[in-house]
Each structure stands twice: as C-alpha cells, then as structure tokens.
C-alpha cells in the first residue's frame, strides 16, 4: 500500500510540474521558449507573471530566459533552445536599434521550422513578414506619447499657476528617455511634449521649456537602455543641485517614457523635499500603469500614467501560442479590431490618473 501511495504521489508531482516554466533552465524537446530582454523591468515582469499563469492554465510547457539587457546573450539562448528541441519562440527582443537582431532570430526559427512571436519591443513589419510563422504583439507606440502629452497638457492648463514655481509664466520640464533607437521611446519623447504644447497653445499658454538650454536633445536617456529608475534618480538628483527654486530656475515638470523612470525621478524629488505628501508637488507623468505607479498616484507623489495592459498582452500571446500549436488560423480568438494586416496585434492603451 505504501509503495502504491508513493507511486501515486510521484505521478501527481510529475503532472503538477508538467506545465511549469523554469527561468533559463536547460530546456527540453517540445517546450515553448519565452525570451525576455530583462527580468528587472517592472512592466515586463508583469507580463511574465501573467503569461506564466496563462501558459500553466493551458498546460503548455515553457521555459523563461532572461537576457539581462544583452542581445548576444539572448541570441545564444535562442540557439540553445532550438538545439534542445523548442517548439516555439516567444521573444521580447533586446536590440531594437536595427532590424539585425530580430531578423537573425527569425532566420533561426525559420531554419528550425518553428513559429516565432515577438512582443512589446518594436520589430519592423519587413522582419515579421519575412516568415509566415512570425507575428508581433505590441501597441500603437505613437499613441502612448499622444495620450501622455494630452494628459499633461490638460493637467497644466488646470493647474498652471501652481506648477509654475518660479512664477516666470513658463513651465520648465525634464524628459527621461528609456533607450536610444527604440521606436516607443522616440515616439513618447516627441509626442509627450508636442501634444502637450498643442493643448497649451490652444489655451493661450507658452510651450514647455526644457530646463537645460545647453541640451539640444531635450531629453536625458538611460545610457544602458534599460529604462531604469536608477538612471532617472541619478540624473534628477544631479540636476536638482543646480536647478532649484533658490536659483530661480526650478524643474517644474517631469515626463518619463515609463513608470520605472517616473518613480526614480520621484525618489530624487522626495530627497529634495518635494512630493512627500505635504508641501509642494512637482507633477510627474509616466507610462505603463504599474502597481507601484498606481500607488504613487494614490498617495499624490505622481499625477498620471498611460496604462499598458500587461495582462491583455499576455492573454493574446498565449492565444497565438495555442493557435500555432493547434494549427488554427493565426489570429483565431483575437479581437479583430486589434489585428493589423497579417502580421501584428495591437494592445490598446488607456489613461490612468487614479480617477478611472
């Protein structure tokens, strides 16, 4: 009887782990291989958590890989997974500055005759369309910048006098860019300001003014391309030592490409005595609507963000995975309104200010 019980327990353990993923383990034949540009990105971690749950719920064996921001590492991980017999690649590509990295991964998948699904970080249509078993799941990356800019502009029109700390009739801002060469970062950096200026102009207010006139780029970029809170904290801590109310040239507005950088900026502001829950607030805006950002909005240290739906993205990724696995039409079960041509699914954005 004891022997039978032991056998049954062993069988249950095997079943319970059948759909579980590892984090960059050795890999095995038939599994779905999921590659993340980094595990440390808060939004991407939200996608990973949701996707792990959906994959397990659908009894899909999978393995997660962390490239830690290194494209060479990710490409080697892809090669290893294919050599181990992976049945499908789901890729959050590291390098978005050119088509080379994504095209190389497509070529590897094509040679192995397995599907590849890219997500979140932009991959050009020409790359995706070069293989009939390749699709991309992302967002209308320009829309996040447009929505953020409009949200900022409307907030400033309603609160102009309060935000204009030095009373010069203009709003001085800092922009934190996540990565050079990344299409999402480029669009958010441009439209976050342009669309805000359009709202200000319509209200008879002057354009935003970048705090440092010597910076012709009009942004500060994470040199590691990781969209990190640390980069924003370091930049803003340094800037606040020179640009302050005491000097009459205060930074009065913070715009960030993502919530991680927005939260990093808040850390620097709080160290300088702002956004602490009492006293003066310098408005901070981000993108992603992470839980940490929602908490910051709730406690008043952040004003607003643009929701990037991590759960919605994970759900679509797993639906596409099942479609490829089961031989169904690629976009079966996906909202047709979000399907672009034969190569892409866009996950909608939404504004988030804590009131919606």
Stretches with model-predicted labels:
Residues 105-143, 147, 159-172, 176, ...:
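Flexible loop/hinge segments that line or gate small-molecule binding clefts
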């Amino acid at each position: 009887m004891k022997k039978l019980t032991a056998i049954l327990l062993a069988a249950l353990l095997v079943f319970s782990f059948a759909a579980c993923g590892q984090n960059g383990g050795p890999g095995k034949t038939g599994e779905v291989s999921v590659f993340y540009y980094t595990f440390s990105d808060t939004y991407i971690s939200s996608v990973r958590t949701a996707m792990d749950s959906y994959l397990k719920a659908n009894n899909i064996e999978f393995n997660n890989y962390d490239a830690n921001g290194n494209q060479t590492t990710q490409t080697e991980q892809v090669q290893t997974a294919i050599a181990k017999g992976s049945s499908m690649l789901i890729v959050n590509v590291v390098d978005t500055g050119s088509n080379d990295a994504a095209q190389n991964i497509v070529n590897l998948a094509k040679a192995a005759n397995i599907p590849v699904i890219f997500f979140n970080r932009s991959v050009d249509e020409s790359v995706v369309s070069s293989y009939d078993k390749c699709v991309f799941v992302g967002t209308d990356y320009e829309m996040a910048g447009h929505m953020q800019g409009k949200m900022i502009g409307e907030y400033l029109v309603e609160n102009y006098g309060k935000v204009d700390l030095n009373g010069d009739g203009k709003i001085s801002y800092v922009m934190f860019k996540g990565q050079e060469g990344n299409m999402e970062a480029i669009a958010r950096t441009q439209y976050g300001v342009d669309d805000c200026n359009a709202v200000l102009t319509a209200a008879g207010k002057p354009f935003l003014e970048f705090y440092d006139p010597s910076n012709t780029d009009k942004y500060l970029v994470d040199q590691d391309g990781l969209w990190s809170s640390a980069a924003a904290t370091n930049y803003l801590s340094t800037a606040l030592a020179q640009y302050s109310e005491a000097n009459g040239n205060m930074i009065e507005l913070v715009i960030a490409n993502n919530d991680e950088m927005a939260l990093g900026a808040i850390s620097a502001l709080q160290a300088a005595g702002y956004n602490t829950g009492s006293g003066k607030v310098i408005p901070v805006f981000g993108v992603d609507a992470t839980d940490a950002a929602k908490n910051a909005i709730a406690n008043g240290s952040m004003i607003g963000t643009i929701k990037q739906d991590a759960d919605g993205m994970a759900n679509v990724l797993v639906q596409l995975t099942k479609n490829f696995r089961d031989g169904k039409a690629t976009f079966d079960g996906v909202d047709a309104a979000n399907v672009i041509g034969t190569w892409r699914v866009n996950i909608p954005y939404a504004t988030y200010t804590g009131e919606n």
